[in-house]
Amino acid sequence: MKIKAPVITIDGPSGSGKGTVAGLLARKLGWCLLDSGALYRLLAFAARNHGVDLTNEEALKLLAAHLDVQFEATAAGQGQRIILEGEDVTHAIRNEQVGSGASQVASLPAVRDALLLRQRAFQEEPGLVADGRDMGTVVFPDAPLKIFLTASAEERARRRYLQLKAKGDDVSLSSLLDEICARDERDTQRAVAPLKPAHDAIQLDSTELSIEQVLERILSEIALRGIAG
């Protein structure tokens, strides 16, 4: 029987830094990267492009099964480009409206089922770093290392505010905090695959930690468990 490539999962709420940490970790290890949140953002983005209502579960399920999407590594390992139906949407799917839509469609059981096998297909040699909200609980429950990364809602809103201001966006810190709290409630209260730590996950609060400190903590766990060579 073929031994599957190892997986490290990094779950957590919006703005916890999981995407940044996962990208840095994947590059450090030379592993594949799954940004599962991007799949839900892509679905919400495609739904709006095709006039599909975000409450129409059957139509969204069909759209999810036939998403024409590619993830392409950029030069020198600087992240990835996301191509949807031939168009580079890497930045277009990162706005707050698409993020809110992603949270909506992620609460639909049929949509999650449609994307499950698609996510598991990313598990390839030499290994996979997967970030999202249910990577350790649902998608890769047998992963040898599971991280649940969090931070206070206020700190997560502050980080997002600084990101958006740096891009020149006109945003309000208070409105971002409201949106993060609303997303937290949707993600933790949904009936299917709610946001929660896996029973065997290592929980890290990054409120007062730098990205580098979080990465070092995870690398220490990898070394301790002998996961990456």
UniProtKB/Swiss-Prot annotation:
InterPro entries assigned to the protein according to its UniProt record, in alphabetical order: Cytidylate_kin, Cytidylate_kinase_dom, P-loop_NTPase
Location of this chain's protein in the cell: Cytoplasm
Swiss-Prot/TrEMBL catalytic activity: CMP + ATP = CDP + ADP; dCMP + ATP = dCDP + ADP
Biological processes per GO annotation: nucleobase-containing small molecule interconversion; pyrimidine nucleotide metabolic process
Predominant place of localization: cytoplasm
Keyword set includes Transferase: yes
Enzyme Commission no: 2.7.4.25
UniProtKB keywords: ATP-binding, Cytoplasm, Kinase, Nucleotide-binding, Transferase
PANTHER family (UniProt xref): CYTIDYLATE KINASE, CYTIDYLATE KINASE/PANTOATE-BETA-ALANINE LIGASE
Family in the record: Belongs to the cytidylate kinase family. Type 1 subfamily.
Name of this protein: Cytidylate kinase
Source organism phylogeny: Bacteria, Pseudomonadati, Pseudomonadota, Gammaproteobacteria, Pseudomonadales
Gene: cmk
